[in-house]
Amino acid sequence: MKQQHASGRVAAFFDLDGTLVARPSLERRFFAELRYRSAIPMGNYFSWLARAVWLAPCGMQMMLQANKMYLRGLPKDGRESHNGGQPPRHGSGQAKMAVPRFFPEGLEQVAWHAQQGHAIVLVSGTLEPLAQEMALALVVRLALRGITASVAVCATRLEQSGGRWTGRILGDAMFGEAKARAVAQLARCKGFDLTECYAYGDSLSDRSMLEAVGRPAAVNPSSRMERLARRRGWSVFTWREAKDLTQSSQRPAQRARRGDEPLLGSGRVG
């Protein structure tokens, strides 16, 4: 890796689900939390099904990614329940997702980028409010290490009306080509040199984003993603939850290095 003489022109783009945090996805966790709090009106399930039928010709992936009708009419701050007027099962009734833990090795990689002066950007198909919560949590975790950094977010935006979600999204769901377009647009606005930028993702929906930068890496990749990464000569990492680190540390870690770049976790190239 060449020494960075203009670190302000470099960004590190991170997917969230499966890359920085373990699955299930953030949206699935949020949906489960809403259901547990009885925050979803029964009619929203039928609205979701109707929307799914309408999107069916676009394929299963689009049917799931662009269909947020289960959120229709819900207040954006998550207050209120729809359980027959009974108090919510949790004190305040706020339907907010508990922030999951970041992979320790992923957090180390983010910290390294922040220390180099690289911009940190979360590029995720999850709902924008959830990605913003994760960005805030990431800023806090970095601050605990004495690192001051901001974290930008590119995620699936939700339409609002009168302080409530309509169930429709604004623009495209942040998957596939939409990720690459978001990265390119941000690069134009911020003056990033994409040939010097980094991107981390776990699935083929991240492929376009990884292809858009000069330093792509597959993290905890699906089998198809790993085959692609090997063909392209991309770095491949395995980042684990904290409970798995003791076991993994007993095996010699293979590390692929480019100059002074730390590649964390069980890393390999091609």
Q: Would you name each region that the model predicts?
A:
Residues K2-Q3, S7-A11, G93, M97-G270:
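C-terminal cap/substrate-recognition subdomain and adjoining C-terminal extension
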Residues K2-Q61:
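Active-site neighborhood of HAD-like aspartate-dependent phosphohydrolases
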Residues R23, R79, T156:
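Active-site phosphate-binding/coordination module
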Residues P24-R28, L64-Q65, P129, E177, ...:
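A generic alpha-helix surface/boundary motif
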Residues A39-F46, K76-S81, A143-S150, L194:
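Short, surface-exposed acidic
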Residues A39-G43, G85, P216, S235:
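A general structural signal for well-ordered secondary-structure junctions
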Residues L49-K76, A152-E159:
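Short, compositionally biased "basic patch" segments
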Residues M62-E108, Q116:
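Metal-dependent phosphoesterase signature
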